[in-house]
């Protein structure tokens, strides 16, 4: 059996640690079978090929939650680069949790997602869900609460281009630059942006969605780690993008609206001005985990 779990765009503009959406590319693929001992083989991007792998961590977590003693032999094709801002650890975590769920016959979505979040805890120190949740559903997702786990979803299907520069921004560093408090006016603005963005998505108004891809909570501070951000955004908008923002904590960025292939080329050229190579993914939003 094989499962494909796609990349995700966490935050999606103003939804810091709350919004997310699944996209078609890049993706991880995991094949697996029940075994007497744990084993994982990895092809593609460099991640641990042992029990530290988030796919193994999440699979073991689900088995423990279900009160079962089961091991898996897994083969992971790691297509999402680690530390990309595209939900790499979340994709592998969800793949592992789904694999164990299939073996055990577990259908409880909350249990599966909680197990996947344990993989995220192993990777980042925090059992966050803003990547594994949209990776599971594919929809635009809103993490309403963790205790209890509540998720709101809006089905989406629109073109998006994600551009991944050949640089790394450690999540710990991206968190460190955030202030403990933000000005009230910025909080008010983000509430307006986030609530309007949800309505625009429900109305399928992509131009409004693009206009609302702004953020006053994290982006102003994280831009210090991304000296190329403003030039890349300018290139995207001049090429016809409706909106542009950073994916997760970066370094990946994304744009919606217009000719996303041409927008991707324009953004790539902006990065070239900084001597930075990129991978460009012209894809679709609204892609969740798939069995095949």
Curated annotation (Swiss-Prot):
Q: Write down any Gene Ontology CC term.
A: cytoplasm
Q: Which residues bind ATP?
A: 81-91
Q: Which GO terms describe its molecular function?
A: ATP binding; homoserine kinase activity
Q: Which reaction does it catalyse?
A: L-homoserine + ATP = O-phospho-L-homoserine + ADP + H(+)
| Source organism superkingdom | Archaea
Q: In which pathway does it act?
A: Amino-acid biosynthesis; L-threonine biosynthesis; L-threonine from L-aspartate: step 4/5
User: What is this protein's function?
Assistant: Catalyzes the ATP-dependent phosphorylation of L-homoserine to L-homoserine phosphate.
| Keywords on record | Amino-acid biosynthesis, ATP-binding, Cytoplasm, Kinase, Nucleotide-binding, Threonine biosynthesis, Transferase
**Location of the protein in the cell:** Cytoplasm
Q: Which GO terms describe its biological process?
A: threonine biosynthetic process
The similarity annotation says: Belongs to the GHMP kinase family. Homoserine kinase subfamily.
Q: Please identify the protein, giving its name as recorded.
A: Homoserine kinase
Q: Pfam families of this UniProt entry?
A: GHMP_kinases_C, GHMP_kinases_N
EC assignment: 2.7.1.39
What Gene3D superfamilies does this protein's entry cite? 3.30.230.10, GHMP kinase, C-terminal domain
Membrane-spanning segments: none
Broadest EC class?
transferase
């Amino acid at each position: 059996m094989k499962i494909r779990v796609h990349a995700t765009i966490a935050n999606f503009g103003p939804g810091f640690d709350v919004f997310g959406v699944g996209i078609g590319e890049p993706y991880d693929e995991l094949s697996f079978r029940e075994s007497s001992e744990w084993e994982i083989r990895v092809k593609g991007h460099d991640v641990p090929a042992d029990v530290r792998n988030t796919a193994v961590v999440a699979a073991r977590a689900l088995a423990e939650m279900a009160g079962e003693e089961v091991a898996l032999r897994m083969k992971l094709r790691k297509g999402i680069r680690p530390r990309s801002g595209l939900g790499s650890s979340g994709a592998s975590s969800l793949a592992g949790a789904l694999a164990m769920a299939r073996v055990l016959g577990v259908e409880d979505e909350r249990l599966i997602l909680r197990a996947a979040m344990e993989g995220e805890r192993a990777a980042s120190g925090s059992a966050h869900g803003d990547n594994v949740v949209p990776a599971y559903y594919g929809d635009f997702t809103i993490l309403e609460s963790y205790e209890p786990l509540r998720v709101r979803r809006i089905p989406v299907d629109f073109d998006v281009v994600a551009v991944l520069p050949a640089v790394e921004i450690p999540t710990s560093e991206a968190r460190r630059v955030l202030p403990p408090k933000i000005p009230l006016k910025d909080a008010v603005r983000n509430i307006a942006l986030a609530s309007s963005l949800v309505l625009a998505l429900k109305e399928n108004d992509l131009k409004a969605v693009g206009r609302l891809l702004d953020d006053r909570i994290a982006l102003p501070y994280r831009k210090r780690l991304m000296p190329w951000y403003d030039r890349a955004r300018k290139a995207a908008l001049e090429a016809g993008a409706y909106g542009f923002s950073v994916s997760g904590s970066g370094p990946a960025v994304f744009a919606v609206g217009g000719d996303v292939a041409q927008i991707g080329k324009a953004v790539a050229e902006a990065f070239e001005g900084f001597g930075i190579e990129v991978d460009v993914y012209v894809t679709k939003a609204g892609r969740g985990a798939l069995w095949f």
